[in-house]
């Protein structure tokens, strides 16, 4: 469960990071992407572990709320699955394969 939550938070962060404050971005990135402990983050920012914990929990809720409203991550997953199914079903259709590659590159650009 913990790995699944970490993967989900990292994915939601990729989609919605620009909507977070700098502090929220820093805490979430350090905690989930860089695997810092609450104590390490607290020391880095000169705050209590409880303050870091509270901020991370609030930010997790914010990220989940964004996903509930905007569906960017879930739509990306569905879109990727559909493109994969089409690519597997029509492997010899070069035009279709090119279009799938184009759509995939749009989804995966920064």
From Swiss-Prot:
Gene3D superfamilies: Winged helix-like DNA-binding domain superfamily/Winged helix DNA-binding domain. It holds the Pfam family UPF0122. It comes from the Bacteria. InterPro entries: RNA_pol_sigma_r3/r4-like, UPF0122, UPF0122_fam_protein, WH-like_DNA-bd_sf. Might take part in the signal recognition particle (SRP) pathway. This is inferred from the conservation of its genetic proximity to ftsY/ffh. May be a regulatory protein. Belongs to the UPF0122 family. HAMAP family: UPF0122. This is UPF0122 protein SGO_1122.
């Amino acid at each position: 469960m913990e790995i699944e939550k970490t993967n989900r938070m990292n994915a939601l962060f990729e989609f919605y990071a620009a909507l977070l404050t700098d502090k929220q971005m820093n805490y979430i990135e350090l905690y989930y992407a860089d695997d810092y402990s609450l104590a390490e983050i607290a020391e880095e920012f000169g705050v209590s572990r409880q303050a870091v914990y509270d901020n991370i929990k609030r930010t997790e809720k914010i990220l989940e709320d964004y996903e509930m409203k905007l569906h960017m991550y879930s739509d990306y997953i569905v879109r990727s699955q559909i493109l994969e199914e089409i690519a597997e079903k029509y492997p010899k259709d070069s035009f279709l394969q090119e279009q799938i590659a184009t759509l995939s590159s749009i989804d995966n650009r920064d």
